[in-house]
């Protein structure tokens, strides 16, 4: 197919048009007074959201060159969402500001490569400033405040997340589910999560979320590969008779065995799923033993002389529910004996005390958290399904933000931390033409605060000027329309979220500024619609009246 090529100024202008189209749609959601965006769906009710990455992911532009610009900024939002779980709107606003400011300088004849290097150095200086401004989260109150801000100033969500973290520990597993009632509640269930997803996507029970859920399943725990169906068949027949689902945890399930399981799952003969065993080597054996003790099962192990063909239902583990996605498996409410579980916990604690290796200690603590930490389930309630989906997305964002805050600490919110980084960039040792790139970042660091103020109905430049003339965590609280100490007021952002938003924005904007040519498929001008059916289409169907 023929290609169309755009060069230099024309290419950058088209890219900027795409960047602006996406950033304008995302930026309206920024801050506590940000607006909602309604997204049409091919089926079902429209989605109402205030989440930047959800808006960004829906945007596809007709012009291929403009679309390239939009897709590159979409990458900023997606990457920030994947690594920090929040801050997608901030990242988008920053990326647009850096590209827009940089474009003016490139048009004026400055070297794009020098500008990019200046942007990279300024980004480093700004990140150092954020780290210096950062404070660790010490209290449950601070965790609740981070959750509240991320959930669009919803205190209920912030408090529930803080309570969940308090109950299962900061390293514990917290999941978000839809409630049957209008109330948002917290349940803490004993369980275990490990980082292995389903072996085949055909095991999925919810194709929209790509999740496999099994209720009251039997669990077969095998330390080797399963490739032969013959040994597995008696167990499958027994579980099918009982009408119960079966989860297989093994080193791998492949060949004939996997094909048979998938075919039976698709036909509806068996409710089944298979996941790879977590860990490697001796650690895998230990983790499989942990799962066996938690669920009251027996590990199929050659070392112990236990063979698959000799296994009966009594040797299988049991639990209340298993949830599997492409990356993780969560076993909830295992049926193992309490005394056996306590003995295992005691044993792992003794190993932690005895070990001299930091790596081994870390892995043992992970296992301990999985055995005793349990799983906290936040049940999100709302009056309608549309509100439920929107609220659930906010809870997930808030949960990611609080985890990030626990990891790297907190900085003042409301765009103030980025404004405070401007001085650090100005003082950084950046010379020559690269200084122009640093000025681009200094100007862009103002953009999130301007946007928050604009969305709150204030004049961004006036608010920015007032904040610049103060120090530390003093800034503008858009929710209450006051100037105050934002950390005291509970307007805080996780350092990790702000840092990654800035780093991702600088990375992609720098790439776009150094773009000199763009190539896309040429639109086919001869491609028309489908030809009309002869004889006026379906007029001949009138004869079907006689069939009534």
From Swiss-Prot:
Q: Which InterPro entries match?
A: Chaperonin_Cpn60_CS (IPR018370), Cpn60/GroEL (IPR001844), Cpn60/GroEL/TCP-1 (IPR002423), GroEL-like_apical_dom_sf (IPR027409), GROEL-like_equatorial_sf (IPR027413), TCP-1-like_intermed_sf (IPR027410)
Q: Which UniProt keywords apply?
A: ATP-binding, Chaperone, Cytoplasm, Isomerase, Nucleotide-binding
GO aspect biological process, one term: protein refolding
Q: Which domain of life is it from?
A: Bacteria
User: Which PROSITE patterns does the record associate with it?
Assistant: CHAPERONINS_CPN60
Q: Name one Pfam family in it.
A: Cpn60_TCP1
Recorded catalytic reaction(s): these are: ATP + H2O + a folded polypeptide = ADP + phosphate + an unfolded polypeptide
Q: Which GO terms describe its molecular function?
A: ATP binding; ATP-dependent protein folding chaperone; isomerase activity; unfolded protein binding
User: GO CC annotation: what is one?
Assistant: cytoplasm
Keyword DNA-binding carried by entry: no
What is the enzyme's main class? isomerase
The similarity comment for this entry is: Belongs to the chaperonin (HSP60) family.
- HAMAP family listed in its UniProt record: CH60 (MF_00600)
Q: How does it assemble?
A: Forms a cylinder of 14 subunits composed of two heptameric rings stacked back-to-back. Interacts with the co-chaperonin GroES.
Q: Please describe what this protein does.
A: Together with its co-chaperonin GroES, plays an essential role in assisting protein folding. The GroEL-GroES system forms a nano-cage that allows encapsulation of the non-native substrate proteins and provides a physical environment optimized to promote and accelerate protein folding.
Q: What is this protein called?
A: Chaperonin GroEL
Q: Which gene encodes it?
A: groEL
């Amino acid at each position: 197919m023929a290609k169309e090529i755009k060069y230099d100024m024309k290419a950058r202008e088209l890219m900027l048009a795409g960047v602006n189209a996406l950033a304008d749609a995302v930026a309206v959601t920024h801050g506590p007074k940000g607006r909602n965006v309604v997204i049409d769906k091919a089926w079902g009710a429209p989605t109402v959201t205030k989440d930047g990455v959800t808006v960004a992911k829906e945007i596809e532009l007709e012009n291929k060159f403009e679309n390239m610009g939009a897709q590159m900024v979409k990458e900023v939002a997606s990457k920030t969402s994947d690594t920090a779980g929040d801050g997608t709107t901030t990242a988008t606003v920053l990326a647009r500001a850096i590209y827009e400011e940089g474009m003016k300088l490139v048009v004026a004849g400055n070297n794009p490569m020098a500008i990019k290097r200046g942007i990279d150095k300024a980004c480093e200086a700004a990140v150092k400033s954020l780290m210096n401004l950062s404070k660790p989260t010490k209290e449950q109150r601070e965790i609740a405040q981070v959750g509240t801000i991320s959930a669009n100033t919803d205190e209920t969500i912030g408090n529930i997340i803080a309570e969940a973290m308090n109950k299962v520990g900061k390293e514990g597993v917290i999941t978000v589910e839809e409630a049957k009632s209008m109330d948002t509640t917290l349940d803490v269930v004993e369980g275990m999560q490990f980082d292995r997803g389903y072996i085949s996507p055909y095991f999925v029970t919810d194709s929209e979320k790509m999740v496999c859920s099994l209720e009251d399943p039997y669990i077969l725990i095998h330390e080797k590969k399963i490739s032969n169906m013959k040994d597995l068949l008696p167990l499958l027949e027994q579980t099918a008779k009982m009408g119960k689902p079966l989860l297989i945890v093994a080193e791998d399930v492949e060949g004939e065995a996997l094909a048979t399981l998938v075919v039976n799952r698709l036909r509806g003969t068996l409710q089944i799923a298979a996941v790879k065993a977590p860990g490697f080597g001796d650690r895998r054996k230990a983790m499989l033993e942990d799962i066996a003790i938690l669920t009251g099962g027996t590990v199929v192990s050659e070392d112990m002389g236990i063979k698959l063909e000799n296994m009966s239902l009594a040797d299988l583990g049991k639990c209340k529910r298993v949830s599997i996605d492409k990356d993780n498996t969560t076993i909830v409410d295992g049926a193992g004996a309490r005394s056996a579980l306590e003995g295992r916990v005691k044993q792992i604690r003794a190993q932690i005390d005895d070990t001299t290796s930091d790596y081994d200690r870390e892995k043992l603590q992970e296992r301990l958290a999985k055995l005793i930490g349990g799983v906290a389930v936040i049940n999100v309630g709302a009056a309608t399904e549309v509100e439920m989906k929107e609220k659930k997305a906010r809870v997930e964002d808030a949960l990611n933000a609080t985890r990030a805050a626990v990891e790297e600490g907190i900085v003042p919110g409301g765009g103030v931390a980025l404004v405070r980084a401007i001085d650090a960039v100005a003082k950084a040792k950046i010379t020559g033409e690269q200084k122009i790139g640093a000025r681009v970042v200094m100007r862009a660091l103002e953009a999130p605060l301007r946007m928050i103020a604009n969305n709150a109905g204030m004049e961004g430049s006036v608010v920015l000027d007032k904040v610049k003339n103060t120090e530390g965590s003093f800034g503008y609280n858009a929710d209450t329309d006051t100037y105050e100490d934002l950390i005291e007021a509970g307007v805080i952002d996780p350092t990790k979220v702000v840092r990654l938003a800035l780093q991702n924005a600088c990375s992609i904007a720098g790439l776009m500024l150094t773009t000199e040519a763009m190539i896309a498929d040429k639109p086919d001008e001869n491609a028309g619609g489908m030809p009309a059916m002869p004889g006026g289409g379906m007029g001949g169907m009138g004869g079907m009246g006689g069939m009534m």
